[in-house]
Amino acid sequence: YLENKNTNLEAFNRYRKLPTIIETSEKWDVLRADAIGDEAATQFVFVGSGHEYQRAKEMKATNGTFILPLEYPKPFQSQDLMNVEDLDVADLKHWELAPYNAVYMAKEKVPFALTMYKLKDKKSFLDKLRDLNKKGLSKEEILQSITEKPAQILQVSSLGNLNKGSMANFIIVSDDLFMKESVIYENWVFGKQNIINRMPDTDVRGDYQVQLNNQTYDLKIKGKSTKPEAEITQNDKKGKIKLAVADYKMAMEVKLPNDSVQNYRVMLPLTDYKNRTGIAIDKDGRNIPFTIKYVKAFEPELKKDDKAKTDEPGKIWYPFSAFGAEQLASQQ
């Protein structure tokens, strides 16, 4: 051995206390690599290919942790009907199910982290996470997969948490991170502050009741905290309203639902805007009594797509081919 040293094995033995990460190109690579790891008494961490869902139970049996990519197959496009006939049904099935890879792995309780590795459009990362939530992966599972799990894989206890003494790596957001209206204000990396969007002085969003010209109206302020929008209604009729929030003031220009001619301007200090009696100024410069009363906090409106149940994927085929069955054949 002294004459024919294997430097690869020497390096492997020298650093075997460190996590050993191996990249795979398809699901069977995982099982082959796991067999090699068993022979070497080493548990690998597997960088997935996106096909792991096809054999999630076998992935679970490796006892390994996975790093799952978020780049999925693009839709197949062809203007030639003859070319369409040449498409592999297994490829079409993979296009359908690949975005559910992490969902299937979570159902089998396979530990995994999510990665931006191989993601062509890095800016789509947050959208990918939100889409996984729609597809059935819980918010807690998603957040763990980008915080706690990566830290556990690297065996670094000072990362992936907000415990005292840990590295200050976190983001500050306006709302639930998985809401479309959510705005990222700050990103802290190793204790260094990075301002992404200026945090508003006050989040004015919510439902209010307004009295003007001896009439009562409903005022709803919604949208993003950094760029709120408003609407004013009375029963089923809508008025028009322009809203601006700046310099610790909230300014509104209002056209009431039953009056398309008159304009009213209102200026409120953000130190006292929720419950206030003051004046509105009409287009002729007259002071009109005005009262605003806070009713409840902002609640995002769910669109029809959001109200729908979690997306349900099609069945996995065994084997994963055109004539596969929906149930894995049992041994006789």
Residue ranges and their predicted role:
Residues N287-Y294:
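Soluble extramembrane regions of membrane proteins in the secretory/endomembrane system
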Residues P19, T65-V173:
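His/Asp/Glu-enriched, well-ordered alpha-helical/loop segment
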Residues R55-E58, P75-M82, V183:
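Short, charged, surface-exposed secondary-structure boundary motifs
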Residues Y1-V45, S49-F66, E96-K109, D127, ...:
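Histidine/acidic residue-rich metal-binding segments in metalloenzymes
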Residues Q54, I67-P69, A98-A102, K107, ...:
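Transmembrane beta-barrel architecture of outer membranes
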Residues M199-K220, K227-D236, N275-N287, E299-E301, ...:
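Tryptophan-anchored aromatic micro-motifs
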Residues M167-P200:
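C-terminal cap of metal-dependent C-N hydrolases
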Residues V210-T271:
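Central antiparallel beta-sheet cores of small beta-barrel/beta-sandwich binding domains
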